């Protein structure tokens, strides 16, 4: 009833991470597990697991980070943030996975906010090496009825910077979220 959701486990190489568990009545949603890194050329990194949802007073769990891609492959997408409880914000989206010469994984979408709370921030796009493209930032989560949408995530850095994410929609009485910053070009990104 009052417990937090359990965290999702990490994925096997190239596999999706486990989803975070839902929270009890007043607990926080569990964080999503990280996607598995790929060591095989051409194989995409695993996607991050989704964050667990909260019920009443707790925030949604954060999405897991995407795994790094094998040589020439894209990084895995970040997991989506869990929905926030009635009075709490949505979880942030997970980071996109790193790619050496491919495209960094997209950042995860922020979780929706509860009735009176803002949406979660979108995850940062995955970085890439100098020959790759940074991942797109995640979309901000939608705001609750009386709250603003979450900000979009920043684009990942790389040979070409990734586009910033879109801000989340505001609730009926809330403002929309700000868009994310574009990623830095001609830069070796990190995970």
How would you label these PLM feature ranges?
Residues 1-191:
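Collagen-like Gly-X-Y triplet repeats in extracellular proteins
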């Amino acid at each position: 009833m009052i417990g937090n959701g359990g965290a999702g486990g990490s994925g096997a190489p190239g596999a999706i991470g486990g989803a975070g568990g839902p929270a009890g009545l007043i607990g926080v949603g569990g964080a999503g597990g990280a996607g598995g890194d790929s060591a095989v050329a051409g194989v995409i990194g695993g996607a991050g697991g989704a964050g667990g949802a909260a019920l009443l007073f707790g925030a949604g769990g954060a999405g897991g980070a995407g795994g790094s891609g094998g040589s020439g492959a894209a990084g895995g997408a970040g997991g989506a943030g869990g929905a926030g409880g009635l009075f709490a914000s949505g979880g942030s989206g997970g980071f996109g996975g790193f790619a050496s010469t491919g495209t960094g994984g997209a950042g995860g979408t922020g979780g929706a906010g509860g009735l009176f709370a803002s949406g979660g921030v979108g995850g940062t796009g995955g970085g890439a090496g100098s020959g790759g493209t940074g991942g797109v930032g995640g979309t901000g989560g939608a705001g609750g009825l009386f709250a603003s949408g979450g900000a979009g995530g920043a684009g990942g850095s790389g040979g070409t910077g990734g586009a910033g994410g879109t801000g989340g929609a505001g609730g009926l009485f809330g403002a929309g979220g700000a868009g994310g910053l574009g990623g830095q070009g001609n830069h070796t990104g990190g995970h």
